Amino acid sequence: HSQDSVKACADYVTASNEEDGVALAVEKAIIAEVRAAEIPLDQLNAQARHALMGNLGIQYTYADEDRVEATMPVDHRTRQPFGILHGVATLALAETVAGLGSMILCQPDEIVVGMQVSGNHISSAHEGDTVRAVATIVHKGRSSHVWNVDVFTSTNKLVSSIRVVNSVMKKR
């Protein structure tokens, strides 16, 4: 029986231990049944270090069913050639916080995918600053969630106001 268990676990492992292969297996086999609301923010941040979030320096700082917050540095990864925050990085930050918010609201047998992101860039953030995204739920339906995400500079100047629509689907 232990050989069958090891074989089943090996079917999940798609990367070496150096690439978090074991962590990936545990995530797929065990953590998949855990609600996002039950996972500490530091663990969510650590899991994302090799994903877009990690590449952009995004860190979750607060999360509950009504609000999610995260920060992102304005640096070589997230700025335009002119030294100001890139609009697409801002939209990625918004979709990230709204995505976690929807995952917190979902049941373990559901997944969330982004359907629409639209934003208005109101002012700029400059290299060296850290922006903060605040996502609040506008609509929580059975099959979709709508989030408003405001992005602020470290001095609380509004940079962007973004609307994110997520689709809620049953896992296959």
Regions found by a protein language model. Give the residues of each.
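Terminal targeting signals and extreme-terminal segments of soluble enzymes
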Residues: 34-172
